[in-house]
Amino acid sequence: MKNNIMYYYNIRIDNITQNNNNYYFTINNDNYCFTIYTRDIKESNEIYKLNKYMLSSNILVHEIIPNKDNYVVTIINNIPYILYKIYINKNKKLTINELTYLSNYTYQVDKILTRNNWNILWSNKIDYFEYQINQMGKKYPILVDTFAYFTGLAENAISYVKYTTLETQIETSDNPVISHRKINNTIESLYNPLNIILDHKSRDIAEYIKLSFLNKNTNIYQELDSYFSNNYYSEYGLRLLYARIIYPSFYFDMYEQIIQGLRKESDLLNIVTLLDDYELYLKEMYYYLKKYHNIPEIDWITKK
């Protein structure tokens, strides 16, 4: 891969290290990552435009480097790749302040990068997963045993979003902001241009709240107190936030990793053992959020 990078980007590399689909190298003390491009090819130009806008506005983000022919995506052996320069310590832990920093920025972009029809996206994902389970269920007994519970949670979240759009008004505070497809424990992916989309500001915070449960973050409510003191939420926005907290993205992410052979199926048991605590967490989070707006309750959660 080193020779390919040197050829397509006219750069000299002494050493390169591989971690899964990522190739890391350093030039003049600058760190780079050459990685497989996993987004829709049709999005690549908009991703690059957004990346240039963020850089020109002094918004922290890794910098996409076009190849020698000025293309964003480089095809090697029929596989699309992209190169970007890393601007942060990739091992630094994620904080709620990092999320807030990026969610303060809006951007007028082609709808191709916008992800705001959650109930449709979630419904389509569940339908596809149900098809997979029917085809491969015997191979994954733990997935089969847990699937109905987590799709039930997802259906609750979908209904919550549907009623939110029918019963509440969107305000200017609900405009799409810089958000992320995935949130994890370190901040390298937070500033990865391939991870950036436009969505409601509640998206990233909800994922952080769920991650806080899995990481046993005992300071989450103090962090949220600080967050809400500086970030106004409409009733519409707060209901979206709670819907996304209910939606078990951590389960479906693990589901996909298991199907792709990236994780062991037995890893699911670590989540299953936490279900009672997680239901209590959903209840506590509902009453916490209700301080800001009188959002609807879900009976089976609040009566735990």
Model-derived segments and spans:
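ATP-binding pocket architecture of kinase catalytic cores
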Residues: 30-112
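Active-site acidic catalytic loop and adjacent metal/ATP-binding pocket
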Residues: 26, 159-205
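Active-site activation/catalytic loop segments of kinase-like enzymes and analogous catalytic loops
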Residues: 202-234, 245-271
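ATP-binding glycine-rich phosphate-binding loop
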Residues: 2-29, 66
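ATP-dependent phospho-/nucleotidyl transfer catalytic cores
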Residues: 15, 38, 115-178, 222, ...
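ATP/Mg2+ or Mg2+-diphosphate-binding catalytic cores
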Residues: 252-304
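Short, solvent-exposed loop/turn elements at beta->coil junctions and helix N-caps
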Residues: 21-23, 67-72, 167-170
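All-alpha amphipathic helical-bundle segments outside canonical DNA-binding/catalytic cores
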Residues: 117, 235-243
